[in-house]
Amino acid sequence: MNNSGADEIGKLFVGGLDWSTTQETLRSYFSQYGEVVDCVIMKDKTTNQSRGFGFVKFKDPNCVGTVLASRPHTLDGRNIDPKPCTPRGMQPERTRPKEGWQKGPRSDNSKSNKIFVGGIPHNCGETELREYFKKFGVVTEVVMIYDAEKQRPRGFGFITFEDEQSVDQAVNMHFHDIMGKKVEVKRAEPRDSKSQAPGQPGASQWGSRVVPNAANGWAGQPPPTWQQGYGPQGMWVPAGQAIGGYGPPPAGRGAPPPPPPFTSYIVSTPPGGFPPPQGFPQGYGAPPQFSFGYGPPPPPPDQFAPPGVPPPPATPGAAPLAFPPPPSQAAPDMSKPPTAQPDFPYGQYAGYGQDLSGFGQGFSDPSQQPPSYGGPSVPGSGGPPAGGSGFGRGQNHNVQGFHPYRR
């Protein structure tokens, strides 16, 4: 609808509509007083729910007086309040409370005939309020404030009387008993009646405000990605930059990569490792001890590495150990008695999926080993010479040839 001054002629403002009232029912009701050329119900833009009021325009402006003379009006079980829409410039000063409520200081001739009613019971409607306050004078308007989201009264409203004497009689009692509940009643003062201190924020500034850059610089820093890490005290460190001397962060979710695969050099170890056999140096069957590098540590200098095998690099983060293939030799003659040293090199262990240097330890001197369970005796003890190993627990490799008559 156009809100120009000429378009206001013949138009009615209808307040107090029920939430279920539609434009069709509103038009049908007022059609009994004359031809309705336009009808609209104001709705909330967000929820598309009725706001409780609307406008009706008649083709004949005289129909407005007929509607006002036929009060009260009831639609969909609710009392409605139709009022003429007078152009703003044609309203008399007394009937323009909006300007007195919004602008300028309060004066004697800007007093409003409106009272504020607070603490209204939830089961009290506009009809009950009108019936109660009409004993103080002629009630011209009843406005209850509703919650736009919950679509229910907020517990307060405004009553407008025809004269100021009725307002004085109503506010003589500060508290009124309405439907068994104590209700506060006081004169409704214009919005700017009280002096406002300089610099004090207005009513429109008390709403929710969005503070720009609320993070104060925190939001300007991008979060670390998977290829980045966190330095000391939670500082962000770009990808590839050293973090506290630990080198560049590994790829992935921050977890170090698994040790390089030792194909055909590492034996499958059950949970907890093999128990060390008696008679062998301590730590022989212990699980490998890895350092912060990416490969196993080199063997101690006092232990024997397999012949022909280069020592592993001692630099942390070096490439995986690479052993040369074992020399091809014929199998030992099982009919010959064992000698002091095996007649095949230690590189033969590669065929059994083992390499003791990968565990960080090797064999001790065969002549200094104590006897073990089921193992051959050392030279000088009356038994055949040892081959550097026995047949105790946890051993799944063969150091020397097997003889069927030696146990």
From Swiss-Prot:
Transmembrane segments: none annotated. It is found in: Cytoplasm; Nucleus. GO terms for cellular component: cytosol; male germ cell nucleus; nucleoplasm; nucleus; protein-containing complex; ribonucleoprotein complex. Residues 74-117, 185-407 are annotated as: Disordered. One of its GO terms (biological process) is fibroblast proliferation. SUPFAM superfamilies: RNA-binding domain, RBD. Disulfide bonds: none annotated. The modification N6-acetyllysine is found at K150. The keyword Acetylation applies. Keywords: Acetylation, Cytoplasm, Developmental protein, Differentiation, Methylation, Nucleus, Repeat, RNA-binding, Spermatogenesis. Mainly expressed in testis. Expressed to a lower level in thymus. Weakly or not expressed in heart, liver, brain, placenta, lung, skeletal muscle, kidney and pancreas. The modification N-acetylmethionine is found at M1. Residues 91-111, 185-194 have a biased composition (Basic and acidic residues). GO terms for molecular function: mRNA 3'-UTR binding; poly(G) binding; poly(U) RNA binding; RNA binding; RNA stem-loop binding. The keyword Metal-binding does not apply. Acetylation at Lys-150 is predominantly observed in the nuclear fraction, and may regulate nucleocytoplasmic transport. Residues 280-294, 364-379 have a biased composition (Low complexity). The modification Omega-N-methylarginine is found at R253. Pfam families: RRM_1. InterPro entries: DAZAP1_RRM1, DAZAP1_RRM2, Nucleotide-bd_a/b_plait_sf, RBD_domain_sf, RRM_dom. Its main location: cytoplasm. Gene3D superfamilies: 3.30.70.330. Residues 380-393 have a biased composition (Gly residues). Interacts with DAZ and DAZL. RNA-binding protein, which may be required during spermatogenesis. This is DAZ-associated protein 1. It comes from Homo sapiens (Human).
